Amino acid sequence: DTVEDVRKGLPSASAFGRLALCPGSFTMEKSCPDESSEAAAEGTLLHRYMEYLLLKDDAAEEGMEFSWHDFLNSREYESAELNHEQVELCGRALRLLNGVKEKILDYPDAFFSLVSTEERRFLSDWIEGGEYSGQWDALFRVGSDLLVLDWKFGRVAVDSAEANRQLEALVPLAAQKANEEGIIYNGIYAAIIQPRVAGPASVTFYDDEAISQAEQDSLAVARAAMDPDAP
């Protein structure tokens, strides 16, 4: 499927940092085909490998195992290999994730489990208007909370978790999934892991009030972007 098909022609959380500043860029973006680049291709490969590592660890707890190529075949992805630097980079990403766990868990043996990976969801406001989609890289249950996670493999630091519009838009989608599936949670942590950027992962926390505000703010961004007269 093309990006347009997957997103159903709606604004996507990954662009919310830009759309919040320039709503009209959504219409311009739709009229211009996506340009592939070496960096984008590497980003896709690294995201797939991280998904594989998370699912592999999850399966190992159930006594199952599968290879990288088994994973690629199951997703109908083209065969691909990582070089040594890329494998090391993904290892660093996992270590940064462990740092996030240690930061937010009250005690070492607290409940931590994978809920889903690379899941795209949609959120709509049928009263005020506005609709968007977003895809997290991973969603976890962490003790009595949730953790929504985004990997960034670029060499330039992105906005901190607290100021990140993409994460802000993903949080209501995580809450939506939890509510639909009966997952009880007190709040939602949101984290950005950037293994090519120095320092620990960036983490923030949303309580119920902040989750509701994030939903309103994100739908407002989508609403403005979908306005045909947006500047």
Regions found by a protein language model. Give the residues of each.
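Cysteine-cluster motifs in flexible loop/terminal segments that predominantly coordinate metals
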Residues: 20-26, 224-231
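Metal-dependent nuclease catalytic cores that hydrolyze phosphodiester bonds in DNA/RNA
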Residues: 1-145, 187-189
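Mg2+/Mn2+-dependent nuclease catalytic core
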Residues: 110-229
